[in-house]
């Protein structure tokens, strides 16, 4: 064996010596997540992000984060089968300002509606709102027994299914095309679109459990801070406020300037 120094020993410390454990949470900050004014509950929770270090800015890590919240939590309600997706668009101080990003029905609600002896009718359509958001809406409805019907089954004919699907597409297009995103969300909260479809299709074949089951955000217009501030600032949500955080105005940034109006 060659005589020489043992390199492992001269490097210092034993092999496999424990490193100093640093708590990862000591480098992180909590931010409040603020929902738009159309919802009753404004403060929906908190989110973690690593503090600003060098070129890595904390607010950049928050922008684009998507939160999925039950409508019952947003409206302080009992009915909880709708889930809203909300995306962080801007950070003001310790507040994440979020906007609508999509909607879905819960899995258990969808499964509870699908049954034997009835026809399931589905439709989908891509529609653009007046303020430039491109949405894909999915609708679902089920046939039901007519009054005094003895027969067990209530199947619609293929021609009737096509007529109902056409009506679904017409109503969804009309309701979205003529409104901006805020008004569309206000219609999705109580699902007035589904009720309109159910009413319009009674003459073709009686329906029940008609819902806009899913909304996808396909395209967004260029981000404008003024429009986001309008969603969060002026005007509370529909219904009575509940809690201190309800309908509270979000502080505006120091450098914020209102958008220039084309006509007075």
Curated annotation (Swiss-Prot):
Residue ranges with Basic and acidic residues bias: 242-255
This protein's UniProt keywords: Cytoplasm, Nucleus, Ribonucleoprotein, Ribosomal protein
Could you give a single Gene Ontology term from the biological process aspect?
A: translation
Subunit architecture: Component of the small ribosomal subunit. Mature ribosomes consist of a small (40S) and a large (60S) subunit. The 40S subunit contains about 33 different proteins and 1 molecule of RNA (18S). The 60S subunit contains about 49 different proteins and 3 molecules of RNA (28S, 5.8S and 5S). Part of the small subunit (SSU) processome, composed of more than 70 proteins and the RNA chaperone small nucleolar RNA (snoRNA) U3.
Write out the similarity annotation.
Belongs to the eukaryotic ribosomal protein eS1 family.
Q: What are the boundaries of the region Disordered? A: 232-264
Source organism (scientific name): Ophiophagus hannah (King cobra)
GO annotations of cellular component type: cytosolic small ribosomal subunit; nucleolus; small-subunit processome
Pfam family of the protein (one): Ribosomal_S3Ae
Where does this protein reside within or beyond the cell?
Answer: Cytoplasm; Nucleus; Nucleus, Nucleolus
Quick check: keyword DNA repair in the entry?
A: no
Concerning PROSITE patterns, the annotation shows:
RIBOSOMAL_S3AE
Q: Which GO terms describe its molecular function?
A: structural constituent of ribosome
Protein name (record): Small ribosomal subunit protein eS1
Described by its record, this protein's role is as follows: Component of the small ribosomal subunit. The ribosome is a large ribonucleoprotein complex responsible for the synthesis of proteins in the cell. Part of the small subunit (SSU) processome, first precursor of the small eukaryotic ribosomal subunit. During the assembly of the SSU processome in the nucleolus, many ribosome biogenesis factors, an RNA chaperone and ribosomal proteins associate with the nascent pre-rRNA and work in concert to generate RNA folding, modifications, rearrangements and cleavage as well as targeted degradation of pre-ribosomal RNA by the RNA exosome.
Question: Which superkingdom heads the taxonomic lineage of this protein's source?
Answer: Eukaryota
